[in-house]
A protein has these predicted regions:
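Short beta-strand segments
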Residues: 61, 87-89, 129
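A short, N-terminal "cap"/entry segment at the start of jelly-roll beta-barrel domains
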Residues: 1-46, 133-159
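Ligand-binding loop in jelly-roll beta-barrel domains
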Residues: 81, 101-127
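Short acidic-glycine-tyrosine-enriched beta hairpin
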Residues: 86-102
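Conserved short histidine dyad/triad with adjacent acidic residue
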Residues: 31-36, 50-66, 101
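A short beta-to-alpha transition loop/helix N-cap that caps and shapes the active-site region
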Residues: 125-130, 140
Length: 159
C-alpha cells in the first residue's frame, strides 16, 4: 500500500500573466507515484487526484472542455460558481458534480474565502482541450502546444 498525508504535500501555485486566473493544487496522485508523462497505465494510474484551491475573486482556468477526460469535483470549503454549457450554478461545501468529455466548464471563486475542492480525473491518453471563448485547442504533449491557426501562448485571448 502507498500512503501520503495530504497535509504534508507541497502546494503548487499558478497564475496567468495578468492575474485573472490563479490557483493552487496538491498533486495527490503524483505523491503516490503517478508518472503523468508515461504511457504505461501502471505508472499513469487510472485516475488523477488533486486538491485544488482558488483564491477569493479568482478563476482557476479559462472556460474549457476535454476531448476524452471525465472530471469529478467535490467541494471541501468555500463557495463559488461553475460556468457550464447551460449557464452557471452556485457551489458550496459538500457539493459534488461531474463533467463528461465535451462539456465545457469553469470554476470561479465568488466568495470571501478560498474555494477548496477535490478533482478526480480519469486520466486518458490522447487528451486535448477546447477553449470556446478564445477558439483554440490544447493538444496534450510535453510542450503543451496550443493550436488555432498558429502557435499561441496558453492565456492568449483569455485576459
Amino acid at each position: 500500500m502507498q500512503k501520503v498525508n495530504t497535509n504534508d504535500l507541497a502546494e503548487l501555485t499558478w497564475s496567468s500573466p495578468k492575474g485573472k486566473f490563479v490557483g493552487a493544487g496538491k498533486q495527490v496522485s503524483e505523491a503516490l507515484g503517478r508518472k503523468p508523462a508515461s504511457t504505461d497505465l501502471n505508472e499513469r494510474h487510472p485516475f488523477d487526484v488533486e486538491i485544488s484551491r482558488i483564491p477569493a475573486g479568482k478563476l482557476a482556468f479559462p472556460y474549457h472542455s476535454h476531448s476524452a477526460q471525465w472530471e469529478f469535483y467535490h467541494v471541501i470549503s468555500g463557495t463559488g460558481i461553475v460556468r457550464h454549457k447551460d449557464g452557471s450554478t452556485p457551489i458550496e461545501a459538500g457539493d459534488a458534480f461531474i463533467f463528461k468529455p465535451d462539456e465545457p466548464h469553469q470554476l470561479e471563486n465568488n466568495g470571501a474565502e478560498d474555494l477548496v475542492f477535490y478533482v478526480v480525473a480519469d486520466n486518458p491518453i490522447g487528451e486535448s482541450c477546447h477553449y470556446p471563448d478564445s477558439n483554440k485547442w490544447l493538444v496534450r504533449s510535453p510542450e503543451r502546444r496550443l493550436l488555432r491557426s498558429e502557435n499561441l501562448d496558453y492565456f492568449d485571448g483569455e485576459e
